[in-house]
C-alpha cells in the first residue's frame, strides 16, 4: 500500500466531503513543481486558485515568515504591531487608495466589502430603508452566507436558506441589464473583472468601463473583486486595468499572502472606509504581524521579478500555442495573461485526470472548462512542456 493511498484513506475517513480533489497527495513544492510522497514530480498549473502567483515556497517570502515568526506572530488588534503599517503602506501605494482594512481570507474580505457598502449607503449616501447591492450571474465571491446569497449556483445555496436579502443579480456582461437594475437604493456593484470559477469568462469590451461610469452617475460604489484575477494573474497588476478603470474599492486576497500565509483586505478612499468606528468590524487575526510581514515580501516579489509583465508575455505565447490545437471538441480557448480556460464540449474532469498521469496538475471549473493558471514564475520552456502534455491529451487520437 502506498503512502499516497494511506494519506487519502485517512483524509477521506475523517474529513467532511466538501471537496472532490484529484487523487494525488502533495508533500513538497518549489516554484512550479510539486512532489508526492513517492517522489513523483508534477507541474502545478492551478497555483491554489491563483494564491501561489509567486511560486511555491519562494525563498524571500519564506525568509520573511521565518524572521517574523522568531519575533512576534499575533497581538490582536487590541494593540499596534510594527508590521501592519508597512503592509498598509504597500497596499495603498499599489492601489492608489487612502485606507486599508485587513482580514484573513478572501471570503472575509468580501463580507467586509458588503458591510462597508451597506454602512456607506446609510451614513454617506443617505439611502433610506434597505440598501441593495448588484452582483452578476456566474459570480464566485466565496462560501460565507453573504457570498452564497449573491451566488447563482443552486448547489452553493442548497440547504443553507434563508438566504440574506439585499442582493440583485444581473447577467454578467449585460450593461443594459445593469443600468436597468440601478435604483435609488443601490449601494454598490460588486464584480469580478474576469470570472474565474465561471470558466475564465471575460466580459465584452467596454462593459466594465461603462459600468464604472454608471456607478459614478448614480453615486454607486464600484467594487472590484480581484481576489483571483488580481496581483499579476491577468498580465496586469489588476484585471480591471484592462479597461483602464479605477474602482472605488478593491477586494484582495489569495496571492496577497504569496501562498504562504492567509491575508486579505479591502482598499478604498477615506470617505468610504471611515464609516467604520471601533467595535463596528474586526478580526482577531486580521492584520497580524506574521501575515503583514509575509504580504510585504509577497508584493515585493511580484514587483521585483516583474511578474505581471511576465504573465502578460508568457500568457500571450501560451494561448497562441493552445489555440493551435485542432480538435472540434475544443469550443474555446480564452484568457488574459496566465489566467486561461480551455472550454470543451464535454466534461473536463477526465482530461484533468489524464493530464495528471502526464505530470501536469490542473482542475476543471464549471464542468466543461480546464483552468490553466500556473505560478507566474513559470518559464517558457516549462510552458512548452505543459503544452506537449495538453496537446497529447486533447489530440483526437487520444480521445478516441
Swiss-Prot record:
Its EC number(s): 2.6.1.13
Residue numbers of N6-(pyridoxal phosphate)lysine PTMs: 254
Secreted recorded as keyword: no
Required co-factors: pyridoxal 5'-phosphate
Record has RNA-binding as a keyword: no
Record GO cellular component, one term: cytoplasm
Catalytic activity reported: a 2-oxocarboxylate + L-ornithine = L-glutamate 5-semialdehyde + an L-alpha-amino acid
Domain of life according to the entry: Bacteria
Pathway: Amino-acid biosynthesis; L-proline biosynthesis; L-glutamate 5-semialdehyde from L-ornithine: step 1/1
Pfam family, one: Aminotran_3
Molecular functions (GO terms): identical protein binding; ornithine aminotransferase activity; pyridoxal phosphate binding
CDD domains per record: OAT_like (cd00610)
NCBIfam families: Orn_aminotrans (TIGR01885), PRK04073.1 (NF003145)
Protein name as annotated: Ornithine aminotransferase
Gene from which the chain derives: rocD
Amino acid at each position: 500500500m502506498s503512502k499516497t493511498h494511506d494519506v487519502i484513506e485517512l483524509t477521506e475517513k475523517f474529513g467532511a466531503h466538501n471537496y472532490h480533489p484529484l487523487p494525488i497527495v502533495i508533500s513538497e513544492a518549489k516554484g512550479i513543481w510539486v512532489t508526492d510522497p513517492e517522489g513523483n514530480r508534477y507541474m502545478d498549473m492551478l497555483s491554489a486558485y491563483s494564491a501561489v502567483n509567486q511560486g511555491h515556497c519562494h525563498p524571500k517570502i519564506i525568509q520573511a515568515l521565518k524572521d517574523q515568526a522568531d519575533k512576534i506572530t499575533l497581538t490582536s488588534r487590541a494593540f499596534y504591531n510594527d508590521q501592519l503599517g508597512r503592509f498598509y503602506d504597500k497596499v495603498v501605494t499599489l492601489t492608489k487608495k487612502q485606507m486599508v482594512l485587513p482580514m484573513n481570507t478572501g471570503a472575509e474580505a468580501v463580507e467586509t466589502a458588503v458591510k462597508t457598502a451597506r454602512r456607506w449607503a446609510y451614513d454617506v449616501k443617505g439611502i433610506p430603508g434597505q440598501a441593495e447591492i448588484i452582483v452578476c450571474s456566474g459570480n464566485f465571491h466565496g462560501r460565507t452566507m453573504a457570498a452564497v446569497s449573491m451566488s447563482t449556483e443552486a448547489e452553493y445555496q442548497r440547504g443553507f436558506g434563508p438566504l440574506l436579502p439585499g442582493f440583485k443579480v444581473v447577467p454578467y456582461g449585460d450593461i443594459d441589464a445593469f443600468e436597468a437594475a440601478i435604483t435609488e437604493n443601490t449601494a454598490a456593484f460588486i464584480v469580478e473583472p474576469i470570472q474565474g470559477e465561471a470558466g475564465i469568462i471575460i466580459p465584452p469590451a467596454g462593459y466594465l468601463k461603462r459600468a464604472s461610469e454608471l456607478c459614478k452617475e448614480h453615486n454607486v460604489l464600484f467594487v472590484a473583486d480581484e481576489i483571483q484575477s488580481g496581483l499579476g494573474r491577468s498580465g496586469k497588476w489588476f484585471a480591471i486595468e484592462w479597461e483602464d478603470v479605477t474602482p472605488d474599492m478593491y477586494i484582495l486576497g489569495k496571492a496577497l499572502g504569496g501562498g504562504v500565509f492567509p491575508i486579505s483586505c479591502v482598499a478604498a478612499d477615506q470617505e468610504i472606509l471611515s464609516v467604520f468606528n471601533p467595535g463596528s468590524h474586526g478580526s482577531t487575526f486580521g492584520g497580524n504581524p506574521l501575515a503583514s510581514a509575509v504580504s510585504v515580501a509577497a508584493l515585493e516579489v511580484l514587483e521585483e521579478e516583474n511578474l505581471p509583465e511576465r504573465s502578460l508575455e508568457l500568457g500571450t505565447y501560451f494561448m497562441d500555442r493552445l489555440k493551435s490545437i485542432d480538435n472540434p471538441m475544443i469550443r474555446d480557448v480564452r484568457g488574459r495573461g496566465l489566467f486561461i480556460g480551455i472550454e470543451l464540449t464535454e466534461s473536463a474532469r477526465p482530461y484533468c485526470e489524464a493530464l495528471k498521469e502526464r505530470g501536469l496538475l490542473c482542475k476543471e471549473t464549471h464542468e466543461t472548462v480546464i483552468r490553466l493558471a500556473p505560478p507566474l514564475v513559470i518559464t517558457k520552456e516549462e510552458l512548452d512542456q505543459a503544452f506537449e502534455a495538453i496537446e497529447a491529451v486533447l489530440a483526437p487520437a487520444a480521445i478516441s
